[in-house]
Amino acid sequence: MQQEDLAYERKLRPIWESIEIGNYKKALQDVEKMLKKKPTLQCARALKAWAYQRLGRTEDSAPLIAALEEEQPIEATTLHALTLYYKETQRLDKICTLFSNAVRQVPGSEELLSQLFIAYMRIDDFKALQSVALQLYKLRPRNSYYFWAVMSVVLQALRGPDAHNAQKAQLLLVLAQRMVDKFIAENKLEGAQEAQLYLQILQEQHKYSEAYDFLQGALCQKLYPGAPVYLRIDLLKQLNKWGELNRLLKELLLQEQDRWDYYQDYINSTFELIRAGEKPDGADYTVEMCHEFLCDIIEAQPKKFRGPYLARLELNRRMVEQRYAAEQLFGKMSDMLAEYFELFADKPCCALDMKLFLEFVKPAHERRTLATKLMNGLGLSSATLPASKEQMQRHICTLQIARYSGAHAIVSEELLHAIYTSLSLHYEHGYNAYGQGLLVTDMGPSDAYALLAAQIMYERAYRMQRSEPAIEALCLLNHLLGNSVNNFHGKLLALQLYHRLGLTQAAQSAYETLDIKHIQLDSLGYLHCAQLANAGFPALAKATYEQTLYFFLNDIDANSEFPKALYNFGTFSKLVEIVDFRSRLANSYHFMLVTVETLLLMVVSSGGTLSQLLAAYRQTRRKPAEDRIRWDKLHDNRDLTIFVSWDPPSDEEEQEEKKDKPMDNGTGGEKEAPVVAAVTKPVGATLEERRERLQKRSYEQDYDLLRLRTGLSKMLFSLVELHLSRTSVECSAAQQLRDDWVTVAADIRSKQHAPISGRYLVNLLPSRLHLYLSLPYERVFTQLADFVLDLWKGYSIEQLTLAADKCSGDVTAIHETMKRAIETYHQSADLLWHWKMTHELVNGCIEMISLMVFLLAVCYDKYLHAPTSQAQPSAGKKVKKGPENSAPNTATTTNASNDASSVVPERERLVLVTKVLRELKQTINAMDLLLASWKPPLVEDSLSAAIERMSLNPKCASTVQSTIAENALTEVRDLRKLLKDKLKLMSKAI
């Protein structure tokens, strides 16, 4: 028997290989041959189902899988094949059932139990993990299995269903501690990871004293001799042992004199000692002692480190924030920053360091005075160029500080242009003098000039509401990227600027040069994908969305295997992080939005017949009534730190920050402050809070955008399902989703969201929510839904005629909206500056028309093939059930007493659908004429001449010029083709 199994396994191997390399038809041929010889061979049937699944033939694979599930296989290769099948179909819970049945039949199998453990791990069933781990431990008493169980209990407490119940979570943590205590008492603890897990359990229970004693004890020193010092630091902070912490950090700083994190904790411990009034031996418990220690490090250091100098600034900053008197400070903040500048301005990080402390130079005009002082100290003027690379870096630093201090915000547009010209020339000089012979991966030392100049020029364009300065900025960025091909800052600014101008095709090219991959598709994808849905290039948007979705769907599978490796190696400390990471990725806002937009885009961009579109829809459709978005767990994974911003905070931001400032604590002119505030913001907290406020405000708008688009998608596809399945259940669901759409749209409109300012280039781009609120989406799709629901019910010919007239009126209104947008654009003095707003409105109108065509084409197709009788018996039953099961419809005035005799014949409903489709045809033809008359924006020749006078590469100007023209012409061509495709879609009806 064993020899027979081996023979079959050898014959199955080529089938495995065929599936793995994508030769599914060959695999099916081979497996059919095997099944003719042995029809009951389970592994062959599993492989056959898997091959069918890979070919998209789900209806053929489902019966095979169902039969195998009934048989409950236990053979290893069959289980493996079924596991792969379930993974690909996103049915991970079925793997648990599969191995659970196998374990029941072979109770003593360590291999099957291990596979069952991994299966539960994939779906985060921590309670089942605990049970299986204990079974493994009973079968084979090994520490690894026991601590799998312990970790499973910890995960139940921290991330399980009872994690939000403090009492249950505490009981679970106590259980986990007792399980480890038992091993400690029996002297069974063996490894560092086990000791680390015990420390984690104690910390989660806030038993910091026990954790500290264990960390310092002989057992931990033996098992975990390499315990990182931050564990001790964190525990001392939690225990408020500030004196001991202060002494420890002093020792560490004498060994590592450039550790900025140690300096921050050291200074914080000093202020905590002052607040508590403690004076422990060997600790620094006054600001004078702290300052003296820092000065000693500065004097003793063998070479110049930034750490102790930053620590002096931080000490002074804390004293300013605690309202110490001016004479108590160790210097004026502006003077200390000037000193820091003299020491480290030749390093690119200097301006970023100083930015953390500039807010404490008050009042605001003092910051500009400081910037002027730094600039004057360089000995450079507008007519002189830096004599060395170091002097150039100092000059760049002063320019960045000047911009952040608001120096550019108070000057005229003409002076901004002069600054831009000067920076462009400085960039060119720096590139020629110091940027030659660098590696391809290196950024040029003078690149910062060009980056700053581009941002300044965009600000000028925004002030003037003209595109010429923005085009000059684009030319400079293109010139920069020609010299420094891997300067991602330049690529990001170019991408942002293209989107600001509505140049989608050029933005796509910039996005591709960034080479964003893997997790960056989630954290940085918003920079581009958020703008694509109504950007005029549906095919391009579809390809980008599919690439993004491929990452999410495949990476979720890959990430489900990470905990397996962590359990195998006993790396328990990272398990909670991995669970959180998987949750953030699976519930990513970006993932959900792209999923919804892809479904809508599939309809809008479709270029085939209705049958082809419905075939594509059936492959991707989900039940519209099922909401697969876990709204309470949605996570905003955007990385807003990707842009290095030197723009000054707005007046609104500064006013908001003033509200949070602490009141004077009354230190007056005393030598030492008797009272120190318990909470002091860490350095850079204001910048972080400013970013968080912006992210929160932006996310609120984007969250509502997702609600709006999800509501539209679900309502639209429920109406499609209604006419495909034609059941009263679908009617009730569609009616409910229509009412939900109305409620959501009204709620979002009532919030009156204001767009995010576009004054600065690196600001977040406005949410597309404002586009949809400016167009009649709410009215158009509500009335369309009412019409389609009334069509299905067929109560009254008068009511149906009225609903059809409303839809026809909406079609006309959409055309008028598009016509006004293009006419306003043509009347504007600067076509390119108004291109973005116009092309978004045009694309929004075309999307509305496309969605209407799809839904009404489905209705037409169903009524066209309806029986010729006046009313179907089944239809009469549906009509009686409909009003009882559906929510009230404002457009419905009849009641459940209508019987089959009052139902409008389906042929008459077909006439009304045809009427609206004909109106759509006329409108589409009129819209096509509008698109044909839509003038592309052109770059003036005088601008090209100005670019050449600045000694930039003339190719940059011609490249930008052709990019703008090509973008507009291609967009118009694609949109006209899309409209022709819509005519083809409804060709039967008209």
From Swiss-Prot:
- Region (Disordered) residue ranges read 645-672, 871-902
Q: Which residues form a coiled coil?
A: 964-986
Q: How does it assemble?
A: Component of the N-terminal acetyltransferase B (NatB) complex.
Extent of Basic and acidic residues compositional bias: 656-672
Q: Does the keyword Coiled coil apply?
A: yes
- Give the source species: Anopheles gambiae
Q: Where are the TPR repeats?
A: 76-109
Q: Name one GO molecular function term.
A: acetyltransferase activator activity
Task: Please note every region of biased composition (Low complexity).
Answer: 885-902
Q: What is its main location?
A: other
Which keywords label this protein?
Antimicrobial, Coiled coil, Immunity, Innate immunity, Lysosome, TPR repeat
Ranked from the top, the taxonomy reads: Eukaryota, Metazoa, Ecdysozoa, Arthropoda, Hexapoda
Q: One GO cellular component term, please give it.
A: NatB complex
Its biological purpose: Non-catalytic subunit of the NatB complex which catalyzes acetylation of the N-terminal methionine residues of proteins beginning with Met-Asp or Met-Glu. Has 2 roles in the larval immune response: required both for the phagocytic degradation of internalized bacteria and for the induction of Defensin in the fat body. Within the phagocytic blood cells, has a role in detection of infection and activation of the humoral immune response.
Signal peptide from the UniProt entry: none
Q: Which PROSITE patterns match?
A: TPR_REGION
Family as reported in the entry's similarity comment: Belongs to the MDM20/NAA25 family.
The protein's name is Phagocyte signaling-impaired protein
Q: Where in the cell is it found?
A: Lysosome
Biological process (GO) annotations held by this record are: cytoskeleton organization; immune response; innate immune response; phagocytosis, engulfment
